[in-house]
């Protein structure tokens, strides 16, 4: 079950098990949609939200972009696994223009396919000695075949309007892990999210949360205590890639918490 892009911690390997716990719904709300590995692979209609506006704008642009358009940019910049200077030129041009198509092409050539955006909105991922492959076009085609059911938004999770009949799926940054995209997530943000989920439960709205209770010796005591009010399913998975190449293969208690 492919996403639109490679994305740290994506749920494509876990999704079959997760979907077995999803309820019936009028609309699927993916509150932290990331690489779309969930949004693209559930029944619509879907609201795919992520606070990272450049990524959401990239998805919106991709709806009207052909694969030939992607190849034209790669040819124009003479990009390959060894074209570091050409990659840096493309990165410079994206940071000047904020053209979402350039961001999409950049991510194929950046380190671990990561999209790092700094506080100024600039793409900062270094060259990754990589380029497109067969899976790149496969992901693109999967996106194009499944994007019609999706409405995109780039709001803070507290600002998304949740309707009666929605099912709200959340896969937030994890408080106790060290991935790059978790660095702006604080205990206050965690509390705000848990309070939001409690309020949804009070309204009779179904939710499900992917998270980790323990990771490499750390414990999310806040989440563990909160989860006692709900159903907790313990999961086992292997991430698509581990950018920190941790030698610890065990010690992560990944869970799905739902009402």
From Swiss-Prot:
It comes from the Viruses. Its EC number is 2.1.1.72. GO terms for biological process: DNA replication; DNA restriction-modification system; methylation; mismatch repair; symbiont-mediated evasion of host restriction-modification system; symbiont-mediated suppression of host innate immune response. Optimum pH is 7.0-8.5. It catalyses: a 2'-deoxyadenosine in DNA + S-adenosyl-L-methionine = an N(6)-methyl-2'-deoxyadenosine in DNA + S-adenosyl-L-homocysteine + H(+). Changing residue 127 to V: No longer methylates hmC-DNA-containing DNA. Keywords: DNA replication, DNA-binding, Host-virus interaction, Inhibition of host innate immune response by virus, Methyltransferase, Restriction-modification system evasion by virus, S-adenosyl-L-methionine, Transferase, Viral immunoevasion. InterPro entries: Ade_MeTrfase_dom_2 (IPR023095), DNA_methylase_N6_adenine_CS (IPR002052), M_m6A_EcoRV (IPR012263), MeTrfase_D12 (IPR012327), SAM-dependent_MTases_sf (IPR029063). Belongs to the N(4)/N(6)-methyltransferase family. Also acts on 5-hydroxymethylcytosine (hmC)-containing DNA, the normal base in this virus. May prevent degradation of viral DNA by the host restriction-modification antiviral defense system. This is DNA adenine methylase.
